[in-house]
C-alpha cells in the first residue's frame, strides 16, 4: 500500500488542495482546517448549510493563504489577523478560542456566501480536544469535525462506484490521505498504521453525512447518492457489530473511511510513501458483493 494523494483543507468546508507532501502536526496536517467560517456568534458553517462553499478555491501563500471565488476576485488571508480579536467559537459540541479576521475579509466572505459571516483562525495556543473516548491526555484537533486526519482507500471508492449508476470522484468524501494498493475497506480494521516514517493510530471509521451528496464542482446537492447505496451495506451494525460500544458508533451510522490521530508529530509524509498496517482488528466482516 502507498499514499496516492494528500489533501488539505485550510478553510473548513471550502475547496481542498492536493499537495505532494505535508508536515504532520499534533492537530492534523499543517494548514489543514486552521481557518473556519462562522456566524457572528461563533457557530461554525459547513457545506451542509451552504453547499456553495465547495466553489471557493484556497491556496497557500507566504505568510498565509489565498482564496478566490468566481465573480468576487481574490483575497489574501494572513495567518494571524493584524488586529487581535479573540472570540469563543463552536464546532459541534466543542468550544475553542479563535482569532477573528478583519472586517474587510469578513465582508468578502459574506458577499461570496450571500449571508453574514466571519472568518476565524485557530492560534497555536488554542486547545480543542478530540473525543474523550480516544483522548490519551494530550490529543488535539483543528476545526475538523472530530479527528486530525481521515484516510480512504481507492479500492473502497471503487467498490462503492461498482454499485452506483454513475461513479463519484474521491473529492465527494474529502479525505486527507488516499491509499492505493489496499483491499476495499482494509482501513476499517486498522489499529495502528505507519506511513513513511510517521505512525498513526485509528480512532473510529468516518461516519458519513449529507456533504457526500454535494457535487463539489457545482456547489449543489445532487440527489441521495452515495448515502442511499452506502446505507445498504456500510451501516455500522452490519460492518462491525462487535465494536459499536467500544468505538461509540451508532448502529445505523454509515461508515466510509478511517479517522486517524498522529503519533509522530513533526514528520513529513509524501505521495508515494508506503503504508503499513502495524496492528489490525480481527474481523469476520466480508463486504457485500455487487449485484
How should these model regions be labeled?
Residues 1-291:
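Metal-cofactor-dependent catalytic cores
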Amino acid at each position: 500500500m502507498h499514499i496516492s494523494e494528500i489533501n488539505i483543507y485550510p478553510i473548513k468546508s471550502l475547496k481542498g488542495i492536493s499537495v505532494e507532501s505535508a508536515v504532520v502536526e499534533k492537530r492534523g496536517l499543517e494548514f489543514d482546517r486552521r481557518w473556519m467560517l462562522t456566524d457572528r456568534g461563533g457557530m461554525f458553517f459547513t457545506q451542509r448549510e451552504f453547499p456553495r462553499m465547495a466553489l471557493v478555491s484556497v491556496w497557500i501563500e507566504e505568510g498565509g493563504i489565498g482564496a478566490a471565488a468566481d465573480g468576487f476576485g481574490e483575497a489574501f488571508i494572513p495567518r494571524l489577523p493584524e488586529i487581535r480579536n479573540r472570540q469563543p467559537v463552536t464546532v459541534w459540541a466543542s468550544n475553542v478560542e479563535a482569532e477573528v479576521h478583519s472586517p474587510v475579509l469578513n465582508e468578502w466572505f459574506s458577499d461570496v456566501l450571500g449571508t453574514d459571516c466571519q472568518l476565524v483562525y485557530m492560534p497555536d495556543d488554542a486547545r480543542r480536544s478530540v473525543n474523550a473516548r480516544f483522548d490519551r491526555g494530550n490529543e488535539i484537533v483543528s476545526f475538523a469535525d472530530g479527528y486530525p486526519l481521515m484516510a480512504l482507500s481507492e479500492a473502497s471508492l471503487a467498490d462503492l462506484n461498482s454499485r452506483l449508476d454513475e461513479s463519484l470522484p474521491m473529492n465527494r468524501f474529502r479525505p486527507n490521505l488516499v491509499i492505493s494498493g489496499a483491499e476495499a475497506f482494509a482501513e476499517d480494521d486498522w489499529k495502528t498504521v505507519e506511513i513513511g516514517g510517521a505512525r498513526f493510530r485509528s480512532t473510529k471509521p468516518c461516519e458519513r453525512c449529507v456533504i457526500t451528496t454535494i457535487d463539489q464542482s457545482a456547489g449543489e446537492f445532487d440527489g441521495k447518492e452515495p448515502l442511499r447505496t452506502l446505507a445498504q451495506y456500510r451501516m455500522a451494525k452490519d460492518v462491525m457489530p462487535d465494536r459499536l460500544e467500544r468505538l461509540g458508533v451508532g448502529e445505523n451510522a454509515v461508515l466510509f473511511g478511517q479517522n486517524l490521530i498522529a503519533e509522530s508529530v513533526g514528520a513529513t509524509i509524501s505521495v508515494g510513501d508506503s503504508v503499513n498496517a502495524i496492528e489490525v482488528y480481527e474481523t469476520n466482516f466480508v463486504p457485500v458483493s455487487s449485484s
